[in-house]
C-alpha cells in the first residue's frame, strides 16, 4: 500500500536520453529515442474514481443499511455495510491537473 509509481523498467518517459546517461549518450541514442517515443506531458489529467453509485444513484465511498435486531426482547438498530449492486464511479477529471508521480523534479527544497 502506498507507492503508486510505475513498476516498469526501461526508458524513462520524461527523460531525453535513455537511462539518464551523461553527455556520451547524447548522440545516436537520443535521436533513436525521440523517433520511437512521443513526448509525454508531466501532468495527469484524469484518475480512477474511488467512490461508488448505489441503486438510488447516490455517490459515496461506503454505503450502510440499517437493520433492526431483536435481542432479549429489545429492538436494536445496527448498521450493516452494503457490498452488492454498487457501480464504480469511473474516470474522474482532475481540475487543476496534477504532476505525474514519476516526473523527476524537485518542487520544494529546504
Swiss-Prot record:
Keyword Cytoplasm among UniProt keywords: no
Residue segments, region Disordered: 1-33
InterPro entries assigned: FUS1
Lineage: Eukaryota, Metazoa, Chordata, Craniata, Vertebrata
Presence of the UniProt keyword Phosphoprotein in the record: yes
An example Gene Ontology CC term for this record: mitochondrion
Superkingdom, natural source: Eukaryota
UniProt KW keywords: Lipoprotein, Myristate, Phosphoprotein
Protein name: Tumor suppressor candidate 2
Source organism per UniProt: Mus musculus
Lipid-binding residues (covalent, N-myristoyl glycine): 2
Pfam families referenced in this protein's UniProt entry, alphabetically: TUSC2
Record GO biological process: cell maturation; defense response to Gram-negative bacterium; inflammatory response; natural killer cell differentiation; negative regulation of interleukin-17 production; neutrophil-mediated killing of gram-negative bacterium; phagocytosis; positive regulation of interleukin-10 production
Record gene name: Tusc2
Homology family: Belongs to the TUSC2 family.
Post-translational modification: Myristoylation is required for tumor suppressor activity.
Residues carrying Phosphoserine: 50
